């Protein structure tokens, strides 16, 4: 299931590599044996590294807390490491690197630190982390442009239009953070301490509204980047960069997703500073105001990003016939969740849960673009029946509770059904693990409850998605009395989901009263 992604950054300390020259004592080797080997001049060796401008190889700042997201973003943000190619060098496996963590107390005069209380030292550490994070962010954004964008444009690996789509407004973000870093350095005293940061943040944070366009573009940017990776030249270039020291084992998308990750971290950073700020400090009021500002900005960008993601996927739905088109899809503004599932025949399906309709599709390529062809008629959420199937209750091929060879049990299935007059559908869908299955169940139940509440129907949903009448206490199945009475046509299907995307989707769902949050994309947008 698609959840919004937030990338994980691992860190290792950068090794100090020094070359020790042998002592000059003793006579030089005069009796060197002559060598008849022909050495190829280095100048004749063409290297991709010569085309990449020099960049400072400093790792990503370690985040104090792991952050999850749903814009995308689904970010989807697990590192998309390319599989090693048979013709590439066999590099020793190594973990993702990040830059060394710098502490305020270790950077500035220890004698001064000893004059401060423990709480004040923690406050200075939090302020320094904010400042250091800005410096690292600026460095990484510049690296993304110099080491990826510019060389790919110069070598015509991608067109300027494609690069503009993938990198979006990244260039415009650099001056914003340079301005904050400059102001934070200006108010830092010679001893390294900072007295007030609240007024600076209150004045600077509103400019983060410009993140709107960058975050809203991430879904389309990620899709285009994934598509371009099928090009051998693009794949080769990105793999070489991944193996180079400057990348710190991070792929291009990690760098492109850094601004979003930084944006959602600001509330945490400011709360940490506020937590160590005394009540009588004038900075406290300004910090509280700054937290309210950034929370409002993040919420607004998250909403707009979700709408952008919803539009993106709606535009890529392919209808086999006019009858498949549904006004509920057209009116949807939020994608609660989506992801790949399998049916009981092992067919991979891509399922979308919009605000009021569930759409089951197959991923296809159309005009060199990844699109989603409707597999069956869209199912209105208000009429959808949901059933959590026990492990072993569904057999591959469609049999229910059948005997399995070698007592093999098929796991992580759930069923969605719908019947309206002569129309009926039943789909057995399989998630790739228990967590993904539960995320799908939660998202569907939340979406149905929201739709029923909006329709003014009092009552609650039970664990299987059936409607309970609070007056009689009886169970009422929407659209049909028994789930088992439904026709089990060849639309029966099992699905497997993308975990990261699902968790983000549900995150977004919990944050929005009107729908489930589709976190990576249904993912939490930011």
Curated annotation (Swiss-Prot):
Residue ranges, annotated region (Disordered): 20-40, 464-502, 507-526
Residue numbers carrying Phosphoserine: 47, 70
PROSITE patterns in UniProt: DH_1, DH_2, PH_DOMAIN
Comp. bias intervals (Polar residues): 466-475
Cell location: Cytoplasm
GO cellular component, one term: cytosol
Occurrences of domain PH (ranges): 291-449
Listed InterPro entries: DBL_dom_sf, DH_dom, Endocytic_GEF_Adapter, GDS_CDC24_CS, PH-like_dom_sf, PH_domain, PH_RhoGEF3_XPLN, SOS1_NGEF_PH
Keywords linked to the UniProt accession: Cytoplasm, Guanine-nucleotide releasing factor, Phosphoprotein
GO MF annotation list: guanyl-nucleotide exchange factor activity
Residue span(s) of domain DH: 122-304
Main location: cytoplasm
Superkingdom field: Eukaryota
Record-linked Pfam families: RhoGEF, SOS1_NGEF_PH
GO biological process, one term: intracellular signal transduction
Subunit structure: Interacts with RHOA and RHOB.
Function: Acts as a guanine nucleotide exchange factor (GEF) for RhoA and RhoB GTPases.
Database matches in PANTHER family: RHO GUANINE NUCLEOTIDE EXCHANGE FACTOR 3, RHO GUANINE NUCLEOTIDE EXCHANGE FACTOR AT 64C, ISOFORM A
Protein name: Rho guanine nucleotide exchange factor 3
Native source organism of the sequence: Macaca fascicularis (Crab-eating macaque)
Underlying gene: ARHGEF3
């Amino acid at each position: 299931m698609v959840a919004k992604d937030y990338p994980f950054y691992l860190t290792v300390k950068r090794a100090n590599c020094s070359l020790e020259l042998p002592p000059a004592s003793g006579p030089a080797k005069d009796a060197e044996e002559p060598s008849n080997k022909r050495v190829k001049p280095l100048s004749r060796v063409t290297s991709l590294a010569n085309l990449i401008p020099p960049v400072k190889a400093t790792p990503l700042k370690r985040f104090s807390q792991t952050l999850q997201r749903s814009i995308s973003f689904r970010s989807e943000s697990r590192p998309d490491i390319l599989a090693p190619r048979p013709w590439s060098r066999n590099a020793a496996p190594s973990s993702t690197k990040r830059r060394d963590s710098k502490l305020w107390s270790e950077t500035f005069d220890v004698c001064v630190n000893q004059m401060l209380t423990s709480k004040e030292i923690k406050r200075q550490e939090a302020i320094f982390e904010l400042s250091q994070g800005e410096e690292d962010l600026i460095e990484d954004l510049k690296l993304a442009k110099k080491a990826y964008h510019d060389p790919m444009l110069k070598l015509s690996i991608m067109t300027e239009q494609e690069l503009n789509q993938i990198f979006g407004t990244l260039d415009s973000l650099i001056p914003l953070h340079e301005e904050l870093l400059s102001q934070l350095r200006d108010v830092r005293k010679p001893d390294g301490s900072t007295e007030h940061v609240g007024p600076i943040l209150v004045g600077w944070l509103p400019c983060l509204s410009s993140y709107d366009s960058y975050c809203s573009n991430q879904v389309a940017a990620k899709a285009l980047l994934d598509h371009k990776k099928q090009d051998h030249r693009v794949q080769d270039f990105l793999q070489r960069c991944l193996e180079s020291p400057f990348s710190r084992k991070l792929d291009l998308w990690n760098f492109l997703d850094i601004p979003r990750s930084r944006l959602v971290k600001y509330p945490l950073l400011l709360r940490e500073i506020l937590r160590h700020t005394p009540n009588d400090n004038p900075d406290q009021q300004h910090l509280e105001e700054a937290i309210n500002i950034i929370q409002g900005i993040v919420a607004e960008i998250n909403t707009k990003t979700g709408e952008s993601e919803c539009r993106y996927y709606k535009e890529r739905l392919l209808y086999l016939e006019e009858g498949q088109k549904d006004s509920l899809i057209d009116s949807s503004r939020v994608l609660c969740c989506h992801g790949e599932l399998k049916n009981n025949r092992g067919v991979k399906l891509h399922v979308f849960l919009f605000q009021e309709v569930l759409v089951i599709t197959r991923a296809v390529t159309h005009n060199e673009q990844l699109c989603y062809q409707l597999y069956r008629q869209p199912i209105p959420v208000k009429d959808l029946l949901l059933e959590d199937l026990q492990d072993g209750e569904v057999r591959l091929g469609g049999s229910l509770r059948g005997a399995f060879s070698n007592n093999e049990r098929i796991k992580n299935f759930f069923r969605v059904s719908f019947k309206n007059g002569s129309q009926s559908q039943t789909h057995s869908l399989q998630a790739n693990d228990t967590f993904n299955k539960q995320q799908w169940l939660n998202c569907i139940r939340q979406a149905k409850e929201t739709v029923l509440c909006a329709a003014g129907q009092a009552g609650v949903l039970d664990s299987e998605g059936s409607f309970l009448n609070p007056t009689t206490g009886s169970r009422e199945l929407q659209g049909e009395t028994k789930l088992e009475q439904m026709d089990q046509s060849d639309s029966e299907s099992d699905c497997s989901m993308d975990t990261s995307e699902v968790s983000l989707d549900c995150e977004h769902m919990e944050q929005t009263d009107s729908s489930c949050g589709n976190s990576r994309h249904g993912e939490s947008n930011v």
